[in-house]
């Protein structure tokens, strides 16, 4: 992350130092607006050009030569792992998420969802951990796919840009990294496998 207080890197921290007992999971139920499995089941119809284009297919995945491509997102393993509304991870970081019902707050430049969301926070913390999922594609590589901003009482804020492939991967696949033709030049990303509930990097 980059801080607006001088554009200095904000340290991500060492997961070994996480004290689960001091973690406070944030209840986001009021802003959840979909099931994560809906991501490629929707039809993203607007805004679109009225003219012939090579635009993204209406299901939100694929390209002009693969217009029917899709991916079945199965979050059964994630939901089965939830106990009393909490997902306990091997990193020691608990996340509040439901076993049933809406479990994601989607934002989008498509009209299906709002283009931004606000989540009220209070108290003090040394860092914040976010469990995120979303889509990206080849043409969105090396540009901001989204932005997270945390605002403080003193009027300042910290900003984290979500950039493919640095810290924003596609939900349906893992990056192939050989250190040669494809080298992210970034630490391995932790991935939560929705179908099994397993966390790995």
Model-derived regions, located:
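N-terminal/edge-of-domain interface segments
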Residues: 2-201
């Amino acid at each position: 992350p980059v801080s607006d207080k001088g554009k200095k890197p904000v340290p991500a921290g060492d997961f070994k130092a996480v004290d689960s007992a001091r973690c406070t999971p944030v209840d986001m139920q009021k802003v959840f607006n979909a099931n994560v499995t809906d991501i490629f089941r929707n039809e993203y119809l607007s805004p679109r050009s009225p003219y012939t284009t090579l635009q993204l297919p209406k299901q939100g995945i694929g390209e002009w030569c693969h217009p029917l491509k899709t991916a079945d997102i199965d979050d059964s393993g994630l939901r089965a792992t939830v106990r009393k509304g909490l997902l306990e991870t091997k990193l020691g970081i608990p996340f509040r998420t439901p076993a049933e019902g809406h479990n994601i707050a989607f934002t989008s430049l498509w009209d299906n969802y709002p283009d931004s969301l606000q989540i009220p926070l209070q108290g003090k913390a040394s860092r914040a951990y976010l469990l995120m999922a979303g889509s990206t594609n080849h043409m969105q590589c090396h540009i901001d796919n989204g932005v997270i901003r945390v605002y403080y009482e003193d009027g300042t804020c910290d900003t984290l840009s979500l950039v493919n492939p640095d810290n924003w991967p596609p939900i349906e696949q893992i990056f192939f990294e050989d250190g040669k033709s494809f080298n992210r030049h970034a630490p391995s990303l932790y991935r939560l496998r929705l179908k099994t509930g397993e966390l790995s990097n």
